[in-house]
């Protein structure tokens, strides 16, 4: 009931008839999970949302994937955070959308949400050797969008210049598969 009321209020405030995507951010508590999923299904059936999804991580997100009722999933993925790589492929085979967060490893070390461990793996794997004139962020973004089953990636930004650089980088397209394979090989060697 709270989910449905919240969506109705949002629709009124947004002055629209439906949401494009409605997703859980994190797993609902186990005791409310079935009811919460049914609420999303009801909202979709009633035309209040076009698509439903879940934003979570393994292992929790696997339960929702197994339900086979969701249109999209959001989770982290990059060269430095590849835990969900095979899940992206699996979802692509099911025709389910994937929204990637953390596609450039959550930013620069020492700023924002960056994980120094991830960037330490970059250094251990000597990935700077593969940059070929790119900076690390362009390289990571282009690596992320190289996954053939990925639907889209969400890139956070601290300023408009970041947005311009990210759009330019994405416009250059994915990295060569041979480069991506070398990244995976090097990172596996330091894992």
Residue ranges and their predicted role:
Residues 86-191:
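Structured C-terminal cap/extension of enzyme domains
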Residues 80-81, 105:
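Generic, ordered loop/turn and secondary-structure boundary motif
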Residues 1-79, 86, 96, 146:
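Glycine/proline-rich, positively charged
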């Amino acid at each position: 009931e709270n989910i449905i009321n919240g969506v109705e209020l949002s629709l009124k405030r947004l002055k629209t008839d439906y949401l494009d995507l409605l997703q859980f951010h994190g797993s609902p508590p186990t005791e409310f999970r079935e009811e919460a999923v049914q609420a999303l299904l009801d909202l979709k059936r009633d035309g209040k949302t076009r698509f439903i999804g879940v934003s979570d991580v393994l292992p929790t997100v696997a339960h929702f994937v197994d339900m086979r009722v969701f249109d999209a999933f959001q989770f982290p993925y990059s060269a430095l955070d590849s835990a969900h790589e095979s899940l992206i492929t699996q979802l692509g085979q099911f025709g389910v959308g994937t929204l990637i967060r953390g596609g450039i490893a959550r930013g620069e070390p020492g700023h924002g949400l960056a994980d120094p461990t991830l960037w330490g793996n970059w250094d251990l794997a000597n990935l700077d050797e593969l940059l070929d004139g790119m900076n690390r962020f362009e390289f990571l973004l282009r690596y992320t969008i190289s996954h053939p089953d990925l639907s889209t990636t969400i890139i956070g930004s601290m300023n408009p210049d970041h947005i311009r650089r990210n759009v330019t980088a994405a416009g250059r397209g994915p990295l060569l598969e041979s480069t991506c394979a070398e990244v995976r090989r090097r990172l596996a060697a330091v894992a």
